[in-house]
Curated annotation (Swiss-Prot):
It holds the Pfam family PMD. The keyword Nucleus applies. Keywords: Aminotransferase, Developmental protein, Growth regulation, Nucleus, Transferase. Expressed in root meristem, root vasculature, shoot apical meristem (SAM), leaf vasculature and ovules. A motif (Nuclear localization signal) lies at residues 464-468. GO terms for cellular component: nucleus. This is Protein MAINTENANCE OF MERISTEMS. Residues 459-478 are annotated as: Disordered.
Length: 478
């Protein structure tokens, strides 16, 4: 079996034939986190639950075009980026340094009280019933923010706990576990925060990485147009490692994501092609393989103690997610020589997702228990990676950029119109002023008329139906 056995499903197979999907819609939602006003008592509970450092990261402006270009290089067969200079990935140690989340501890397995209705879970752990705001086992993020963003003065300890749990499920549902529909957040997460001290025993960073791996993997498929997960982690990882549109660093602080919290430049969707070309031209001199060495002096000792787990070949566990962590494919990120890596186990057929999940969780838990026993050592070699690079170039797709032509430009415009038409079809216009609603309806009509040229209207209708069906399948795997 070839290493990249899903090439026909991968977005690169579409790009290389001139089929552009455009820039991904990035669904991490951090822009409203500043509305939450935490008291000292709440901050103490947040710290106890393991999110004391992470809450400091807050909102970082996302570069959707850069994220889209990176996703085009991701291969879910190996959970690595395939760059011209070799494979790279986001490793456990990097999660802890960038986000300030623990990567050692109990696995974060999605839990649910089987005999307890989601509304009763909310009543018991939030003190309120989300009337009209609950869909299945998911509550609206809007209701959480409006009901719990500010803890009243003189609140009892019980009320403080309610408001803190609401904040915690809001922040995980908007960031590390953000799905392709972050407007709704799973009530199941409340169970994880029922006891704040026990919550602090979980490996939240490992769960965040498992979830991000799954989201990038899904988004790397040619049929997808949306991505969730902690995209702040992905973007900051790129800034540390790759000299591509890297902003100036700000004040040195921990978590290290704060180094990139400065003002970002305005960007265009055309930047996707610029970034794609830059990644095509990437050579080792433009890669910072070990970028954190100069900042370790500001890292708390509790995080330094677990940096070794970055080299653990293990299974990562998150809510309803199991993903392999393969540092042996990215040894240059640890200052070691890269040799031809061993084979990776094939992904399971997601059609049997429900049947396989329990088995996956059980075997993954056993693997995670041995995480310190499976530390990858130097694979050997004398510093000469020519044999590895020869092998790598024979199994991958090294370049994606295509020289643009008038025909390609027209296709890109049509792709943008298609994307607008698909987004517009999901919008609710009921709450808008009549003049605003009329203006938007006219714009949508103009776009739809433009698509009637040639076969694009039929393509739009077919694409929307196909993506809805495939997105439903993807949601099962989130």
């Amino acid at each position: 079996m070839p290493v990249l056995y899903e090439q026909d499903k991968h977005v690169s197979s579409a790009i290389l034939t001139g089929q552009e999907r455009g820039v991904l819609r990035c669904q991490e939602r951090t822009s409203l986190l500043h509305h939450w006003k935490l008291t000292k008592e709440q901050i103490a509970l947040v710290e106890k639950a393991g999110f004391g450092w992470f809450r400091l990261v807050g909102s970082i402006s996302l570069n959707n075009s850069l994220i889209s270009a990176l996703v085009e290089r991701w291969r879910r067969e190996t959970n690595t980026f395939h760059f011209p200079c070799g494979e790279m990935t986001i490793t456990l140690d990097e999660v802890s340094l960038i986000l300030g989340l623990a990567v050692d501890g109990k696995p974060v397995v999605g839990v649910k009280e089987k005999d307890e209705d989601p509304s009763q879970v909310c009543l018991r752990l939030l003190g309120k019933l989300p009337k009209g705001e609950l869909s299945g086992n998911r509550v609206t993020a809007k209701w959480l923010k409006e009901s719990f963003a500010e803890c009243p003065k003189g609140a009892t300890m019980k009320e403080i706990e309610y408001h803190t749990r609401a904040y915690l499920i809001y922040i995980v549902g908007s960031t590390i576990f953000a799905t392709t529909d972050p407007s709704k957040i799973s009530v199941d997460y409340l169970i994880l925060f029922e006891d704040f001290e026990k919550a602090g025993e979980y490996a939240w960073g490992a769960a965040a990485l498992a979830f991000l791996y799954r989201q990038i993997g899904n988004a790397s498929q040619r049929s997808q147009s949306i991505i969730g997960g902690c995209l702040t982690l992905l973007q900051c990882w790129s800034y540390f490692h790759l000299n591509i549109d890297r902003p100036k660093r700000t004040t040195r602080q921990f978590p290290l994501a704060l180094l990139w919290k400065g003002r970002q430049q305005s960007r265009s969707k055309n930047d996707l092609f610029k970034y794609r070309k830059a990644l095509d031209d990437l050579d080792p001199s433009n890669v910072s393989w070990c970028p954190f060495e100069g900042d370790l002096d500001i890292v708390p000792q509790s995080f330094k103690d677990n940096l070794l787990l970055g080299r653990s070949r293990t299974k990562l566990i998150g809510p309803k997610v199991v993903e392999w962590h393969f540092p042996d494919r990215c040894m240059k990120q640890f200052g070691l020589c890269q040799v031809i890596p061993g084979e990776v186990p094939p992904r399971k057929n997601e059609k049997n997702h429900d049947e396989d999940l329990l088995e996956d969780m059980n075997t993954a838990d056993e693997e995670w228990m041995r995480r310190r026993e499976n530390i990858v050592e130097n694979g050997g070699g004398n510093g000469d990676e020519s044999e590895y690079m020869q092998w790598f170039n024979s199994i991958t797709v090294p370049k994606l950029h295509r020289d643009t032509s008038l025909e390609a430009d027209i296709m890109n415009v049509q792709a943008a119109i298609l994307q607008f038409d698909e987004v517009a079809s999901t919008l609710s216009l009921e709450d808008l002023h009549p003049e605003e609603r009329e203006a938007i309806e006219e714009a949508v009509m103009s776009m739809s008329n433009a698509l009637r040229v040639g076969d694009w209207y039929e393509a739009s209708t077919t694409n929307k139906r196909k993506r809805r069906e495939e997105q439903q399948q993807t949601d099962w795997s989130e």
